């Protein structure tokens, strides 16, 4: 029924697999939650939808384990013509989630894998968007914004460098298209 409606309206279907909800038979087959199991699950779902005559798909495979997520994307890349939505799921609070997302997405995107991204944080969704844009800019995949370069504080500092750097960064954020 869902495939029929998507077909009528030409709406893409997102095929999503999360390591936390991997099918029991695949967990048993691979002796635990693995990148191989995640990829097999995604491809099984893709083939099921293709067998129903539909191929307007987007694939999303995610894990909160950064290296498992990276490995799963490496395994899946090139095995399907469909766009890949990449992200590290359940990555954590703003600090830990940004670090996990930057490392994971950086490793994935730097290999040319991925068409859309999501940074998942336990926090304000606006922070997720800011983080995603910064990850893309840092990798040279997005233009715009002002990069604020500031060095660590030291004994030679005669001004409140931390406060100044924060003020400059806040000001720079007002000009995202420069």
Language-model features and meaning:
Residues 1-30, 34:
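Active-site-proximal beta-alpha core segment in soluble small-molecule metabolic enzymes
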Residues 18, 26-178:
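Catalytic alpha/beta core domains of metabolic enzymes, predominantly
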């Amino acid at each position: 029924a869902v495939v029929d409606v998507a077909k009528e309206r030409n709406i893409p279907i997102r095929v999503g697999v999360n390591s936390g909800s991997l099918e029991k038979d695949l967990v048993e087959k691979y002796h635990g939650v693995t990148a191989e199991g995640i990829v097999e699950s995604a491809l099984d779902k893709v083939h099921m939808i293709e067998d129903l005559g539909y191929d307007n798909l987007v694939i999303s495979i995610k894990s909160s384990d950064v290296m498992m997520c990276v490995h799963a994307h490496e395994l899946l890349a090139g095995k399907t013509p469909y766009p890949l939505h990449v992200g590290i799921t359940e990555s954590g609070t703003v600090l830990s989630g940004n670090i996990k997302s930057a490392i994971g997405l950086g490793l994935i995107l730097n290999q040319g894998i991925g068409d859309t991204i999501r940074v998942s944080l336990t926090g304000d969704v606006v922070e997720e968007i800011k983080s995603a844009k910064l990850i893309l800019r840092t990798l040279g995949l997005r233009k715009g914004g002002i990069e604020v370069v500031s060095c660590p504080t030291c004994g030679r500092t005669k001004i409140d460098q931390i406060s100044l750097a924060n003020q400059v960064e806040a000001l720079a954020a007002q000009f995202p298209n420069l």
